[in-house]
């Protein structure tokens, strides 16, 4: 593919890089010239993606990362810095869902969703920003943090309230962090994808209900991962120097 924005001389850390969007972004960023650090609990999967990147001539490192555990996050950033230097492009992508009506979802399921999708984003973004600020991002203006939200944060529906609320929360968190770090050279933005066929969806879109949902979209299709590529590269690049505190809905018109 043609790379619209270069990430040469950048080091990117992708949280939640073991599958789906995270693994896709890791390969994309490597193609754009970044050193890529893949963080996730499933290290066997991140190792496979890292090996694929290295075999293609890129630079990659797979590290264990549990976004609900601050010590794990710190260790992941330590490993990244030891290998490549300060991480200056961060993607907060880790996320889980516990589908079900709100009256049926168990408390531990709710806590897991909030812990991963909201607290995890907070902790990863905070650790990255701390290190960027300590490395003089104020002068360099090189900090880029991209949060992966969801169009569910802007819609109402049945059966996934915890997930939708967590994504609405991180969108507002992103704006607040952007304001907090605006004079420190750290930009924070949120991308809201539409429905994409990934592991988090399971086999939902093969069911009658899932097929009906797709049929209700204006273009009657799921979104392709690659439709996010240009925006993700842009927000992580030097070209996005003046973009912070923004939300971008990229959903193939699904929310219209």
Task: Please report, for each region that a protein language model flagged, where it lies by residue.
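Active-site helix of classical SDR
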Residues: 125, 166, 174
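C-terminal substrate-recognition "lid" of short-chain dehydrogenase/reductases
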Residues: 84-85, 221-250, 255
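Residue(s) in the substrate-gating loop at a strand-loop-helix junction
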Residues: 150
